[in-house]
């Protein structure tokens, strides 16, 4: 398993080398997020691309049809290579590894801002600015609506969670009540 993991991480490293040589790292990061989003929203594509009953040329045609007009040509060809080498099952790990390597190269990071409601790009930018100062590197945030928050926000950057929401307040209150009840029952 380790060799297999190392093998497909090599694809991410190669993609990084290409994007650096083309001075197009940021565009490739955005294109990778686009690819992840398209496939996440169309799970049937994973079944199609990992199927041995669908010919390679047919897979290439589908990749062209979906992505050619929307992402860099190198990334279209990159998707064809991982489809050809039967690694499409690992597309997500490969692209996420590329994003991580590219962010490290650019001294930046990506995170997610979750709210119970839509927020303006100005507000998102202000959170990016605050977090960039706090973390000492450029932070880009992608917005996601999370109805479980009820109100407030949750920001996740580099496995750190910054949260101020009614949901988190209720969760904390529940934990404190349980702790208080356990302490009271012990007496």
Curated annotation (Swiss-Prot):
Where does this polypeptide localize? Cell membrane
Q: One MF term in GO for this entry? A: proton-transporting ATP synthase activity, rotational mechanism
Which Gene Ontology cellular component annotation is one that this UniProt entry carries?
proton-transporting ATP synthase complex
**HAMAP family reported in the protein's UniProt record:** ATP_synth_delta_bact
Organism (species)? Mesomycoplasma hyopneumoniae (strain 7448) (Mycoplasma hyopneumoniae)
Membrane topology is: Peripheral membrane protein
NCBIfam families per record: ATP_synt_delta, PRK13436.1
Keyword annotations from UniProtKB, A to Z: ATP synthesis, Cell membrane, CF(1), Hydrogen ion transport, Ion transport, Membrane, Transport
Per its record, how is this protein called by name?
Answer: ATP synthase subunit delta
Q: Which family does it belong to?
A: Belongs to the ATPase delta chain family.
């Amino acid at each position: 398993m380790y060799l297999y993991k190392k093998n497909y991480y090599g694809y991410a490293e190669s993609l990084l080398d290409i994007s650096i040589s083309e001075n197009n790292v940021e565009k490739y990061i955005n294109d990778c997020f686009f690819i992840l989003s398209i496939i996440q929203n169309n799970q049937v594509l994973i079944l199609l691309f990992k199927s041995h009953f669908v010919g390679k040329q047919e897979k290439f045609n589908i990749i062209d049809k979906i992505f050619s007009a929307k992402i860099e040509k190198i990334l279209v060809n990159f998707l064809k290579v991982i489809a050809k080498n039967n690694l499409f099952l690992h597309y997500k790990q490969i692209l996420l590894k590329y994003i991580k390597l590219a962010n490290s190269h650019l001294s930046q990071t990506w995170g997610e801002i979750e709210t119970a409601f839509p927020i303006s790009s100005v507000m998102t930018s202000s959170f990016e600015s605050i977090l960039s100062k706090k973390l000492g590197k450029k932070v880009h945030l992608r917005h996601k609506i999370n109805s479980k928050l009820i109100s407030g926000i949750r920001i996740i950057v580099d496995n750190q969670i910054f949260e101020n929401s009614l949901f988190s307040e209720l969760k904390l209150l529940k934990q404190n009540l349980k702790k208080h009840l356990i302490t009271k029952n012990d007496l």
